[in-house]
Amino acid sequence: MTGRKLGLRKRIGLRLFSDLYAEKIAEHKLRTLFWECTLRCNLACRHCGSDCRVDPGVPDMPLADFLKVLDEEVTPHNRPEDVLLIFSGGEVLVRSDLEEAGREVTRRGYAWGMVTNGLALDADRLRSLMDAGLRSISISFDGFEDAHNYIRRNPRSFEKALDAIRLIVREPRLTYDVITCVTSPMVARLEEFKELLIAEGVKYWRIFCRPGQGRSDARGYRRTVPRGAGVHKAYP
């Protein structure tokens, strides 16, 4: 059995699309730039791919150094308004100069966001960050209280993350999502967990499984990783 031959117009169209696609790949415009601004963290999560801790023994990258890279290596080759900067860690909220960093990149024309475990986020800090230009935020929230607190190794981590989520979903000026790292105990409960998020007003949920790296490569954590680790799915 042979397939139908493409007509001349379709062949030309496919060739043009192929050429345009190859051009886009070669151009590879920068849209999102992550700055891992610290390896310090106020938690010691079992699944941390960077093995972050309260005192990692590695100093934070100075803000001046990051701004120098931004000014000399990034801005000359990109339009700032086309690039979203994401501050990540570690836990970004342990940096005392986070608002200063936000103001500096905003002054340069960049939008910026952050990823946080929510433990240190309250209404006052969120207001301070937004005054410094915060545009987007992701909150890590790995399951119901038993699963989340086990992974995060802190009895208040679920409560604080949920409080942070309640703050951000009520802020219309923020783009946000909730991120869930799925472990085996949560696989069968994801549908139920989704209902909890919906009840809290969450509209954007991202789930993934972390392959073994950093502290997540430890035997005790690997036993909790379901098959299909590394798969990402987003629910708008």
Regions picked out by a protein language model, each given a short descriptive name:
Residues 1, 57, 131-132, 136-142, ...:
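Radical SAM enzyme [4Fe-4S]-AdoMet core and its adjacent flexible, acidic
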Residues 3-136, 224:
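Conserved alpha-helical substructure of the radical SAM core
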